[in-house]
């Protein structure tokens, strides 16, 4: 609904080479693997599959510190204060220049995403059900 507004802004800021508005996609996991940092800068969010997909991508996951994203990301990915573009830029720069930090974040993100893997979740539920009998 705001696509035209974003396209205009990209042109005005001369970001055509860096910003691509891809629209609705079915190949999200492949796209996430092609980026250096996954950023989710929402104003608000519930439990988001996008959050978990980003953490499972093999890249660092950075999210705004808002309800929903905080609960999944805190302690695994990197949170930045909501609407603080300076801090977001600093985090992206650090992830691009500090390989040890980058790898640490990637490993924690993968570990968190594994907790939401369907086979791990079904095994956990099975153990709970076994404990009831």
Question: Which positions does each model-derived feature cover?
Answer:
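Conserved acidic donor-binding segment of nucleotide-sugar-dependent glycosyltransferases
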Residues: 78-85, 94-99
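Nucleotide-activated donor-binding/catalytic signature segment of Leloir-type glycosyltransferases, i.e.
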Residues: 6-23
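Aromatic "clamp/platform" in nucleotide-sugar-dependent glycosyltransferases that forms part
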Residues: 24, 43
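Short hydrophobic beta-strand element within catalytic cores of glycosyltransferases
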Residues: 60-63
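C-terminal alpha-helical cap of glycosyltransferases
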Residues: 118-133
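Short glycine/serine-rich donor-binding loops of glycosyltransferases
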Residues: 48-51, 69
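A short alpha->beta transition loop at the rim of the catalytic pocket in nucleotide-sugar-dependent
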Residues: 29, 36, 58
């Amino acid at each position: 609904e705001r696509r035209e507004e974003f396209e205009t802004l990209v042109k005005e800021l001369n970001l055509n080479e860096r910003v691509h508005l891809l629209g609705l996609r079915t190949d999200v996991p492949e796209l996430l693997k092609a980026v250096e940092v996954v950023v989710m800068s929402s104003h608000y969010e519930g439990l988001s599959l996008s959050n978990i997909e980003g953490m499972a991508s093999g890249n660092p996951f950075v999210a705004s510190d808002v309800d929903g994203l905080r609960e999944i990301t805190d302690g695994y990915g990197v949170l930045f204060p909501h609407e603080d573009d300076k801090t977001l830029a600093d985090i992206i720069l650090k992830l691009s220049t500090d390989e040890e930090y980058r790898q640490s974040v990637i490993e924690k993100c993968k570990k968190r995403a594994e907790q939401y893997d369907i086979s791990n979740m079904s095994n956990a539920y099975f153990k709970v059900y076994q404990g009831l009998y």
